[in-house]
């Protein structure tokens, strides 16, 4: 049973919010809503639920007519996330993704489920659009850098070269007619961390809607699937706090509904090795953790799209990244970089339309 909070019929902007994991000093999602008040049914109550999923705390905030409906909807949403994790996880030994990775180099195509096919297909398209900057075959490199962080020691050029030999999105062969995937090179390891969470959040929101709860927000690790606005509000309120003054009051407010929201970057997830700072995000071309200190926010029609774009922008930078966003329908992005002591902010032309009115 998911842990739940007591219902609150009239939240205020000062109430406790959802902290985006790893970005708490910069991004705060308030559980109160924002915007001008409009007449809404008074019967709806606000409920919160939290449960560990995909190695992160997943939180659901929803408005429902009763505790029973809220409980049923949240339970079903968390169950859906757990089921997807068993497909997408690269930690579980018996997940569908792990079994596919184990088949690498076998020379045989492997039938995959509709859920895994959807992500593999999106990954291939995003890799092509980004000229390989987005690449789910980075698993061997991710493993190298996880070990480097634990041991506090840079990987050797030989270790990186060996891992890179097993990386490359073109090494995955998809057959759309047979719905199969084949990993050409032995020792390949797929890592869906850049998109699996977005898909899971979208699906959780879809389940809530199917249970008659459209006024909801689902968040995990700084990413969100956002449904209809809370009662009497225009949208869910997002605070953007200044990066150059941690702990300072927020300087900007967004109002969001019916969209996906994703964050990526190294401002709060990095490691210093050999006197240099490296991001947890790996550049598939160089095999190295990113060293360009950046933080990216993407707003898109769904969290899956936002998730894939935010990671890609971190790798290719603001100029190419915002061009990619401009070519994606209804997507906008904000890129914050910190070269030296100054903070640089670049935004899509349409990002300002999400500002709270």
What are these regions (language model features)?
Residues 2-11, 18-357:
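Mature catalytic core of soluble alpha/beta enzymes
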């Amino acid at each position: 049973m998911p842990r739940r909070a007591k219902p609150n019929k009239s939240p205020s902007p000062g109430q406790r919010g959802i902290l985006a994991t790893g970005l708490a000093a910069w991004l705060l999602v308030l559980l109160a809503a924002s915007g001008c008040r409009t007449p809404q049914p008074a019967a709806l109550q606000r409920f919160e639920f939290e449960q560990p999923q995909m190695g992160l705390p997943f939180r659901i905030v929803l408005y429902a007519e009763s505790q029973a409906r809220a409980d049923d909807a949240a339970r079903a949403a968390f169950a859906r996330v757990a089921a997807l994790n068993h497909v997408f996880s690269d930690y579980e030994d018996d997940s569908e993704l792990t079994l596919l990775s184990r088949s690498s180099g076998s020379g045989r195509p492997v039938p995959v489920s509709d859920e895994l096919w959807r992500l593999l297909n999106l990954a291939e398209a995003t890799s092509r659009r980004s000229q390989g900057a987005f690449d789910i075959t980075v698993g061997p490199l991710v493993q190298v850098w996880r070990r480097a962080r634990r041991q506090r020691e840079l990987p050797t050029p030989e270790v990186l070269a060996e891992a890179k030999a097993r990386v490359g999105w073109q090494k995955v062969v998809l057959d759309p007619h047979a719905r199969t995937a084949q990993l050409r090179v032995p020792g390949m390891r797929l890592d869906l961390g850049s998109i699996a969470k977005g898909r899971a959040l979208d699906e959780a929101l879809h389940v809530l809607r199917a249970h008659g709860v459209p006024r909801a927000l689902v968040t995990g690790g700084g990413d969100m699937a956002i449904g209809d606005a809370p009662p009497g509000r225009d949208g869910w309120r997002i605070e953007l706090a200044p990066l150059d003054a941690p702990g300072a009051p927020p300087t900007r407010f967004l109002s969001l509904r019916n969209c996906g929201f994703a964050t990526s970057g190294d401002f709060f997830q990095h490691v210093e090795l050999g006197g240099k700072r490296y991001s947890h995000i790996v550049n598939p071309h160089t095999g190295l953790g990113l060293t360009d200190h950046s933080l990216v926010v993407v707003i898109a029609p769904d969290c899956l799209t936002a998730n894939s774009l935010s990671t890609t922008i971190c790798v290719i930078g603001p100029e190419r990244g915002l061009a990619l966003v401009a070519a994606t329908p209804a997507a906008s992005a904000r890129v914050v970089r910190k070269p030296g002591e100054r903070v640089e902010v670049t935004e899509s032309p349409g990002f300002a339309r999400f500002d709270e009115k």
